[in-house]
Amino acid sequence: IYDIEFNKVFEGKLGTGLLDMKKALEGINSPALRVTNYVLTDNDDDIFSIGDEFTLGVELFNYLNSVSDLQIEITSLSENVQIVDGIWNVGSIPTSSQKENFDTPFKLMVTSAEEFDQEVIVKLKAYSLPNNYVFEHFFSINVNPSYVNINVNNVKTTVSKNGLFGYTDYFQTNGLGFRLDTLGSMLYEGGLLIGHNSDSKIQVADRVRNGELFDRDFWEKDVISRQDIKGDEAFYAFGSFTDTSANQDEIGLVVEQRVLAYNKIGHENYVILEYEVENFSDKDLTGVAIGLFADWDVTDPSLNKGATAYGKRLGYVYSLGEEGVVARIQALSANVFNTYMIDNVDGGYGGVDIFDEEGFTTHDKYTALT
């Protein structure tokens, strides 16, 4: 099958060609290995940048006949990742049994990257000479990513290159969500919104949902990356983005974003997002409002309630019947403070209705901001 010219780039990934029923029945006497779990980590923020060493731990399950003298080797199909330790002498795996190497995983290193969010393919090959058996599996690894993971205190979250937090896009392609300790993510979507009302025209620049799918107003200028700490923080990152590629909602902004997190006692349960906004358009902006949109899912989303503590300048969401777990956003600046809780029901209980035909429109977003 791989002798065909246009199949060569897919070598090892297309199966074995035409269905051979006789061979399929004979294969019942063969082992049948599958990767049932794996862990990629650098034991830090799991952002694999140039020069970083990371590990790959694999769990294998054998569904059919026992396999003996099993050897496993991983190889990188890209010159951007080097295999530091890629051999695992497994031995035998009986029928309906599993083995893993999480305590002694494979070791890899990122040696180079030509671009951000570069995909690297690592091939795992398992073979047994006594069983005349070979199994291959391919791992896709994102190196030099265009986002940062914050993982230095009880909060685990991700900040993107273009104004989102929790995940890097609406589809949750990459990201930790927003987790507290060992709890699952409490956030479905989160991002920065900047709006203004000038000359009877309302504009809001953002990257969150809209009536079609999501807005694409912010684009990276300097891709966010982790930096050396400047004070007593445990994590610091910096990046910038603009709205110059927006269509109807281009305002003319450059936004510098900073991310800080601390692990000192009493400061383990929050992350700081700081935005410095510059107007480089040729006009003064009036009615400017800046805020964070967050679709919280605390424990049971169907029981979520929202409230505001004006004295503390924060809005928060909690789940009825659950104690202790509360998601909060607090404004740290001295600017005018405002919160808006959107009712997650058809009609919006008379407020902003994100379920109508137009969805979460620019006017809805500006209403929520102001």
What are these regions (language model features)?
Residues 61-81, 86, 288-297:
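Short acidic, flexible loop segments centered on an aromatic residue
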Residues 59-64, 76, 110, 277-281:
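Asparagine-centered strand-capping/turn motif at beta-strand->loop junctions
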Residues 82-114:
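Intrinsically disordered, low-complexity Pro/Gly/Ser/Thr-rich segments with frequent PxxP/GP/PP motifs
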Residues 141-226:
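Solvent-exposed N-terminal domain segments of exported/luminal and surface proteins
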Residues 286-370:
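Glycine-rich (often Gly-Gly/Gly-Pro-rich) flexible segments and glycine-rich loop motifs
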Residues 102-149:
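Terminal connector regions
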Residues 1-53:
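C-terminal subdomain of the subtilisin-like protease fold in secreted/lumenal serine endopeptidases
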Residues 198-274:
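Extended, loop-rich substrate-binding clefts of extracytoplasmic carbohydrate-active enzymes
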